Amino acid sequence: MKKYAINILVILFLLTPFTLFANGCHANNDTIKVLAIGNSFSQDAVEQYLHELGEAEGITMIIGNMFIGGCSLERHVQNIRNNAPAYAYRKVEKDGEKTETRSMTIEKALADEKWDYISVQQASPLSGIYDKIGRAHV
């Protein structure tokens, strides 16, 4: 049963789109909560720029960023399987204050907030290579 649940989580991570502002998906003033599971590129793109874009539009956001430099989808899957405490977890609160926790598991980060959006990032050299995505399955 645990393996089945992990398989479902991995599939959901891989299929979750990362579109926050398209087509008016933010119809009210609630806080949007975004979790990125990625590598060093998610630091700038998610932690800094996304928070600033939301702020400029008057959208309150909480952003979580789980990252390992150069991490591939395959490694993310292994970390999910093993509940590995392999990530640095940076969190940007509503007011923009940042905190960092080392040796974090994906399981703990998922439980930290009721995330609205979750993105999983492939390592840059492997991005767009379909065969590399196929190998990441559970």
Regions found by a protein language model. Give the residues of each.
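Bacterial N-terminal signal peptides that target proteins for export
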Residues: 1-9
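Residues that line or immediately flank small-molecule/substrate-binding pockets and catalytic motifs
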Residues: 8, 38, 122
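Bacterial N-terminal signal peptides
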Residues: 8-19
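Serine-esterase "nucleophile elbow" of acetyl-processing enzymes
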Residues: 23-76, 108
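Glycine-rich, highly charged phosphate/nucleotide-binding loops
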Residues: 83-109
